[in-house]
């Protein structure tokens, strides 16, 4: 994920620089309607492919922005400051000074898992057709049983529903069908399909056409992939495929249209990779409107799916361990939601994105992405329990599946096979597994991530 996206998502190959996040600034972010002018003299224009450290400023479309997290917007991804509020805060309209902003190049980006934070990644394109979002039957009536939570170690990868080779993002391998035998052949046993289109009213569409030749798997193909050993989840969100969490009507429409897709296509679970629009109230014991509506969505989906239907989450670090720095706005916004579903047993595992931003320990300590030290501090914090305003949020090791970039270029904070091995072996098999953005990125550079993790897991 993840911005993956995501993840959630496509990021440039440069490692993100270490930098402390600026939570206080986040809470005071200016809105697009701000009328006071600010000086932009000497401030560089925002550009893709440049690493912006936390706290740095840039101008874009006549406005001044400040980076909330260190980030490197990938070329062609469309991660402009106004499109990525998890990464930038708007300080106001420029008074006339500053450098004109370049026009972002256009290509189909990859999210997470975005990886944002992932900063998650894949804008939702305007569908070329408008099929019914609630089909009532599968071609040929093909169905297959729901798979339970995997009992052993997992290697979870995001499957891209677009062509990353055709758009030049990872030329070595573009779109592949979900039934491609190389996926399980290189160690992946959980696949997260990214991402459906979400319309402004909450309607969810799972359809062909993200790029020429790209097709979503049929129900029969989903069953074929599952028979080959895969557990398959549908990922919701990413950096740009957001949902209006301020509206309960939108939340209800989302549930009403995603449940038929989950059933028709034989998905085993849902992955929550919401990277925009979720904020905390400042009081961890009082849900904000957006938090309440995300819970409304999750509960609505789980209530209509069979018992044992899976739930995973792939938030960026700011939304989870960032709560050790401060609680409010995006900082720690996932914490009440994670706690709810860990405590009630419904969360299969947490896929926090250990990339595209700082990693945090329980004391507000900050570490650069891509370091074993940061990986360990953050993982231990969740297992021990992060205490925020007297409330403890604990995610035990066996419910942690940390997310890492599959290859250099897939996300900031890439860890090579040796560092991944050091991080994994710290826990002597105690972690449930690892997640990566993305399967397609891994395949584009020889599948080294999957092969390494499979060996580490002894599979």
Where is each model-derived feature located?
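Short mixed-charge
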Residues: 384-394
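Bacterial N-terminal signal peptides
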Residues: 11-21
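Feature captures outer-membrane beta-barrel proteins of Gram-negative bacteria and organelles
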Residues: 423-424
